[in-house]
Amino acid sequence: MVLGPGIGSPVRRGSMDYMLMLINKEMPVAPPLKHGIVDVRDVAKMHVAALENDTSIGKRMIVTENTYWVKELCEMLNKHGHQAPTFTPPVFLVKFLANFDKTIKPIKPLLGVDVNFNTETARSVLGYDPVPIEQTIRDTSDFLASYEKG
């Protein structure tokens, strides 16, 4: 999931829409999902670093600050004045509901999966040093709040 401050107004799709859904309580619970989070500024820096570094040719780089459960993201948002959901229903219950709710069905295989990523290649080849998640969440929150205030 790519987060961080944007340029212009946020578009209601992808990661920003997901965060707005949490902030606006359009998602009543924190689903039992774990996401890799990367700051958009890190994505830009790593693109430039890869273009300037011949060692990166032919290599795939994973850039993610770390992985976080949705509940953890909600708790970080709440530290910035939001009231995002912090209750996570049991995996079996959400999987059962996925049989009847077409919005949940696509994520059914990911529910409760403890995903992790290895960023060692990006760190060693490109010097990847990610923006801390707390800063990314704060800056995302501030960006979305400034847009909502007009």
Residue ranges and their predicted role:
Residues 38-41, 68, 131:
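Residue-level signal for the nucleotide or nucleotide-sugar donor/cofactor binding architecture
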Residues 42, 72, 121:
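Ca2+-coordinating acidic residues in Ca2+-binding motifs
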Residues 97-129:
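Conserved C-terminal active-site "lid" loop/helix of NAD(P)H-dependent oxidoreductases
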Residues 2, 8-9, 16-38, 42:
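A conserved pocket-lining segment of Rossmann-fold NAD(P)-dependent short-chain dehydrogenase/reductase
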Residues 5-17, 50-61:
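Glycine/proline-rich active-site loop of Rossmann-fold NAD(P)-dependent oxidoreductases
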Residues 4, 30-33, 61-68, 78, ...:
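Glycine-rich Rossmann NAD(P)(H)-binding loop
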Residues 36, 87, 115:
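Residues that recognize and position ribonucleotide moieties
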Residues 46-105, 133, 137-150:
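Mid/C-terminal beta-alpha module of Rossmann-like enzyme folds, strongest
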